[in-house]
A protein has these predicted regions:
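N-terminal Rossmann-like FAD-binding beta1-loop-alpha1 element of flavoenzymes
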Residues: 2-24
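Short amphipathic alpha-helical face segments that pack within enzyme cores
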Residues: 14, 18, 45, 141, ...
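Glycine-rich FAD pyrophosphate-binding loop
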Residues: 20-38
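A short, flexible beta-alpha/helix-coil linker loop
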Residues: 29-32, 222, 247-248, 299-302
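Dinucleotide-binding Rossmann-like beta1-alpha1 core, especially the glycine-rich loop
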Residues: 41-119
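Long, low-complexity C-terminal extensions of enzymes
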Residues: 65, 322-465
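Predominantly flavin-linked oxidoreductase catalytic cores and closely associated redox partners
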Residues: 131-264, 317
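FAD/FMN-dependent oxidoreductases across multiple families
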Residues: 245-247, 254-358
């Protein structure tokens, strides 16, 4: 199959690398169009899909391990809480009872609490104890990393000026260099410009995910690097801190209905603005339209919280690669409908999960007073007043957000406080002591693990920066 990928950002070169392993692939992108990424996070899916040496990836992407997220000031009941990457990888009843008795449980939680990486001290090689982790990456270096690794036939440094179609299928694209490229599959990774697909094909999420702007900034002082993204609720949205090997990316995500950029910079104080980013939360309706596949920001965007963009791209890409081994299947309308439904449900499931984070009951500004949560989130929160959510309460879709990811957020925002089982625990001291001890045992001891800064120093000392 001959594949033409349009786009040169993180998604564009990540997709080009993946598809070039199994198909004849060319890439069309230009440095004149800047990369949107400002420092990003991934989920465990990233390492799972690419199966590369994590140390090699940390070198090439300026990356460090990400074990989860620390949330500060997201509710009126709790100041801060930790949420492990991809939920809590343990049996369901552990999740339930340790949440009720103490906090979410797992090695990730303990490592984050002690601000350690998942790499051992005093080992001749950098050995990872627990490989279910994401990464904090530099978007620019990640794009270049995959570009260098790709088995691409040719890279066209050009812009698309015309898309030629016949009976709804793309037959060729014309470039500003005069080149005309034909292909069996055309992949749109052109970001918000969506040069290959219909810009009117849009499902809006802004009713529940109202943030639509971000200011990226620097500060004079840097905190120690930690194994998590720091997400802090603010007056008009929230700020992030993402530690990579050579810098700590920072930004303020907000809604321009409630604040101007000047308001944001005033609240932040003594910072240096790097760039501004505009975005819309939502998705397209047709992710696959005959022989045109949309991935990355071209297919949709929720908001920066929970590192959804790269995760969704990989879920869509992997499903497509397994489902469409040959180009003759592009004419199968049932397969196309099933793929589009899968991608739509995947995005909607992630929208619900991100919406959950805004349910902590904050009312200190108009932004927090006005923000709404989705119908599904309302249902789950209502359920916690009667019983604990179970796995069957969540959508059955590969890659969708499961109970394991919801529980730490529900606990951290205080939604378990009104659960009858929690109230029983609060009066049953023996059960409380038992499950707190089990949580401590399950988390283990972290004294033989490197801090993130120690890990970073070791990577630098290897001389491959």
């Amino acid at each position: 199959m001959r594949v033409v990928v349009v786009g040169g950002g993180t998604a564009g070169w990540m997709v080009t690398y993946y598809l070039s392993q199994i198909h004849l692939c060319v890439n069309v992108s230009t440095k004149e169009i800047p990369i949107i990424g400002v420092g990003e996070g991934t989920t465990g899916k990233f390492l799972d899909v690419f199966k590369m040496d994590p140390v090699d990836m940390m070198h090439g992407m300026d990356a460090l391990p990400k074990l989860g997220i620390k949330f500060d000031n997201w509710s009126k009941t709790k100041k801060s809480f930790l949420s492990p990457i991809d939920g809590t990888p343990t049996a369901s009843y552990y999740i339930d009872y340790t949440c009720l008795a103490h906090r979410p449980v797992g090695k990730h939680i303990t490592l984050m609490d002690d601000e350690k990486s998942n790499y051992f001290i005093d080992h001749p090689n950098l050995i990872c104890d627990y490989n279910q982790n994401g990464m904090h990456i530099d978007a620019y270096k990640t794009s270049e990393f995959f570009k260098q690794k790709s088995s691409v036939l040719k890279h066209y440094d050009a812009k698309v000026v015309k898309v030629n179609r016949e009976y709804g299928r793309i037959t060729s694209i014309e470039l500003d260099t005069g080149d005309v490229l034909k292909g069996d599959l055309f992949v749109d990774c052109s970001g918000f410009s969506r040069v290959l697909n219909d810009p009117d094909d849009w499902v809006d999420y802004s009713e529940y995910l109202p943030v639509n702007r971000a200011v990226v900034y620097r500060t004079e002082t840097e905190n120690p690097r930690r194994p998590y993204t720091l997400a802090t609720a603010r007056k008009y949205g929230w700020t992030w801190e993402i530690p990579t090997r050579t810098k700590i990316g920072k930004g303020y995500v907000y809604c321009d209905k409630y604040a101007s950029e000047d308001d944001i910079l005033e609240e932040l104080g003594d910072v240096e603005k790097v760039k501004s980013v505009e975005f819309k939360s939502g998705r397209i309706a047709k992710f696959l339209d005959k022989n045109c596949l949309s991935l990355g920001l071209s297919s949709g965007f929720l908001e920066p919280l929970q590192a959804t963009s790269i995760h969704l791209t990989l879920m869509q890409l992997e499903r497509f690669a397994y489902g469409y081994p040959t180009e003759d299947l592009f004419s199968d309308e049932d397969m196309e409908r099933d793929y589009n439904q899968y991608c739509a449900t995947l995005h909607d499931s992630m929208r619900d999960f991100v919406s959950l984070h805004y349910s902590g009951g904050k009312t200190d500004t108009d932004f927090w007073k006005d923000v709404k949560v989705t119908t599904f989130v309302q249902k789950i929160i209502s359920l916690t007043k009667k019983r604990l959510p179970r796995s069957f309460d969540f959508p059955k879709i590969g890659g969708g957000v499961a109970q394991e990811s919801y529980n730490p957020i529900l606990w951290g925002l205080g939604h378990f406080d009104g659960c009858p089982v929690k109230q029983t625990f609060d009066t049953d001291n023996a059960s409380m002591v038992y499950w707190r001890q089990r949580a401590k045992e399950f988390g283990g001891n972290t004294s033989n693990y490197l801090t993130i800064d120690q890990l970073n120093d070791i990577i630098a000392s290897l001389g491959q920066t």
